[in-house]
């Protein structure tokens, strides 16, 4: 349960930081790019003793799968940040957390998690509780936003759900406790590489201008972001990949 608690704390802090960065006028994209650089460095520092050639040879499928996953992290994380800033913290958090129905439903459907009426009741109560907690504030906020911004939480719901589903699938199919370090490191490394390439292009075309404070904000963001995934994988391993329990419980507590 400690891993689950740490996952909740780290994940919740990300939404708060997005809101703070908006108020401080910090370029979100640059912060996210530096955040993934920090995540990659953390992954190497924490896991470097375990990163042997033999481990790579044994778990090359995990490396490839996590690298492909990492390429999806950047746009999804950026979308969550944009939605938090323009559609509001509450509706974005609601959409992100309600996305648990995708990985949790998949876990039950394919038999990763055992079906029980008690579990289904808890699952339904979790969804209802999240909806009721956020319904009032989100309604007020969305009325005040532009029409396009109203759809941002919907995009967050879809992308976050598919991302969590992919993490669950890869963790179940390829990753093991032994290869967990490789999974985390190469997921963030791929996101960092694509982010740096995109940032260089944008700076060259003068679509954005370099912000030194974005580096510091990226460092602050990167620490909880790395450990949110690191402890999520440990939580899934601890609960035997039971996504129907882990994701609803985690998301309900974050709300």
Write out the residue ranges for each language-model feature:
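Alpha-helical transmembrane segments
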Residues: 66-69, 114-128, 178-193
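Membrane-interface interhelical linkers
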Residues: 1-67, 77-86, 135-156, 186-238
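Hydrophobic/small/kink-forming positions within alpha-helical transmembrane segments
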Residues: 12, 70, 74-78, 100-105, ...
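Structural motif at transmembrane-helix junctions in multi-pass transporters
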Residues: 26-27, 79-95, 175-181, 232-250
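Alpha-helical transmembrane segments of compact multi-pass small-molecule transporters, enriched
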Residues: 38-42, 95-110, 121, 190, ...
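Residue-level recognition of membrane-helix boundary sites in multi-pass small-molecule transporters
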Residues: 2, 20, 30, 91, ...
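Hydrophobic transmembrane alpha-helices of multi-pass small-molecule transport proteins
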Residues: 105-108, 118-137
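Hydrophobic alpha-helical transmembrane segments in multi-pass integral membrane proteins
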Residues: 42-53, 104-119, 158-172, 224-241
